Amino acid sequence: MGDVAAKLKIMPESVDTDLVGLKENLKNVIPAGAQLHGDIVEEPIAFGLKALIVTLIVNDEEGGTEPAEEAFAKVSGVENVQVLEAYRI
């Protein structure tokens, strides 16, 4: 099996969410078998709201990004998590 690069979009609960703190909290819950690739990037959405874009390297096995998605969704301040892209590397 190989590895997969997955790009996830994390939407904060509101414009007032502390993105610096949220980034740190997301880094702290990355599950075993996944690693952060690059920095967590802020992407402007609208009216001051910014999404966080996280790129992870995960194993190419069943349920590859699900542990990370579930861990990120449980972080305080996260509204939702969406996989934008996933491709084999």
Curated annotation (Swiss-Prot):
Keywords: Elongation factor, Protein biosynthesis. The keyword Protein biosynthesis applies. InterPro entries: eEF-1beta-like_sf, EF1B_bsu/dsu_GNE, Transl_elong_EF1B/ribsomal_bS6, Transl_elong_EF1B_B_arc. GO terms for molecular function: translation elongation factor activity. It holds the Pfam family EF1_GNE. HAMAP family: EF1_beta (MF_00043). Promotes the exchange of GDP for GTP in EF-1-alpha/GDP, thus allowing the regeneration of EF-1-alpha/GTP that could then be used to form the ternary complex EF-1-alpha/GTP/AAtRNA. NCBIfam families: aEF-1_beta (TIGR00489), PRK00435.1 (NF001670). Belongs to the EF-1-beta/EF-1-delta family. This is Elongation factor 1-beta.
